[in-house]
A protein has these predicted regions:
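Sec-dependent signal peptide recognition
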Residues: 7-18
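N-terminal secretory targeting signals
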Residues: 8, 24-30
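Hydrophobic h-region of N-terminal signal peptides that target proteins for export
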Residues: 17-25
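Compact, glycine-rich, soluble single-domain proteins
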Residues: 28-149
Length: 149
């Protein structure tokens, strides 16, 4: 085989590996959340968002609380008076999950988004991992908001 041909094959192989790697990194998926959760409580009023899941000692396995803010900005949550370990996903206005955090019961430390968010979804701790939902995935927001009507 000629040296030129071998060089071509090597570069082609490297390019193929790069394409596979880039596609793997962008392997986000669309999430139809009602395929995963049986019940979603939507909170959009200020007083409801402030209360969140406070004072509840348990929540069902396939339950979530969906927070809606009037506009997209950096958001914060805390676990004051919340007895259940939770995970929170911060979600941008297009439905993309930008961040996921685990939160400690009764903690007064704020868990803030780094990026601007319009929505958040709180669920039992570990729920996102268990359901293989991760940052970059896109939640179909319209399905949630129309389901509430």
């Amino acid at each position: 085989m000629s040296r030129l041909y071998l060089n071509f094959v090597q570069k082609s192989f490297k390019y193929l590996i790069l394409l596979i790697h880039v596609n793997y990194l962008d392997a986000s998926k669309d999430i139809h959340i009602y395929e995963y959760l049986d019940e979603i409580e939507i909170v959009s009023k200020l007083e409801d968002r402030k209360k969140g899941l406070m004072y509840r000692e348990t929540i069902p396995d396939n339950y979530g609380m969906f927070f809606v803010w009037p506009y997209e900005k950096k958001q914060c949550m805390w676990m004051k008076d919340t007895y259940v370990p939770l995970s929170v996903a911060y979600i941008d206005e297009k439905g993309k999950i930008t961040e996921i955090y685990d939160m400690v019961p009764l903690s007064k430390n704020s868990v803030c988004s780094i990026k601007a968010s319009k929505y958040a979804l709180e669920v039992n701790s570990g729920w996102f991992d268990k359901n293989e939902i991760m940052t970059g995935d896109v939640i179909k927001i319209k399905e949630i908001l129309s389901h509430d009507k």
